[in-house]
Amino acid sequence: MKVRPSVKKMCEHCKIVKRNGRVMVICSANPKHKQRQGK
């Protein structure tokens, strides 16, 4: 899980979701693409 100030889709399988008020990227194809916005 990467924590970044700005999250972007890294491939076509990435999805942007909002959980508990946080913006997150989840990826079914490559788990390395998981990201969360905020510090």
UniProtKB/Swiss-Prot annotation:
GO terms for molecular function: structural constituent of ribosome. One of its GO terms (cellular component) is cytoplasm. One of its GO terms (biological process) is translation. It comes from the Bacteria. Keywords: Ribonucleoprotein, Ribosomal protein. InterPro entries: Ribosomal_bL36, Ribosomal_bL36_sp. Belongs to the bacterial ribosomal protein bL36 family. NCBIfam families: rpmJ_bact. This is Large ribosomal subunit protein bL36. The gene is rpmJ.
